[in-house]
Amino acid sequence: MKKFNKRDQPLYPIIIIHKKRKVIPTTKEPTAAQLEQRVKFNVATKFHAHAKEMLPVIICKKKSLDYKTRFTKMIHHCGFTGSYPDYEVDYSQLQLTTGNLSELFKSVSRDSSGVLTVTWEYERWMGGADDTVNLFVYNSTAKRSYVFGKIALRHQEEMSVEIPGSDKDDVLHIWVFFKSPDHKHISYSKYFSLEG
């Protein structure tokens, strides 16, 4: 009698068939909590569409993939202000950048023509004179965003920039931060808000 040997048997492919489950649409009305969650998600997603334009300026060398994922999570977890259905992202809780460079930003002001002026402190002993100043502005009234990369150097201690299409009554949310010339280091962002 011939012995059964596994090695002599031909191998056959194993086919697994997944039957697609039919989803039956529900006739139930969404709960109040579900409606709130949908509005919050929609608000966060719309802001993310604006904020992601800043990623090329924010990202340091060799950190792009990690930061893109983390950035999305940060926006969705920074909280909301207002009440249903008029929620807004709690912009003050969003730390746009984190890093080891000192930031020392002092103030942001706006004149009647819509020009923003940002000031900061600089001392020679601190080093980093050629760190670049970068700015992200979100106009929550007009739902517009503006990215300004490398608009000044740290040693200049002040810079001004015009926000196109901005009305003096618009609410502006501003994040400003430093980045090293070699794109390897970045500072914590500083948040400012200008009410209309």
Where are these regions (language model features)?
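Long, polar/Ser/Thr-enriched low-complexity segments
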Residues: 1-102
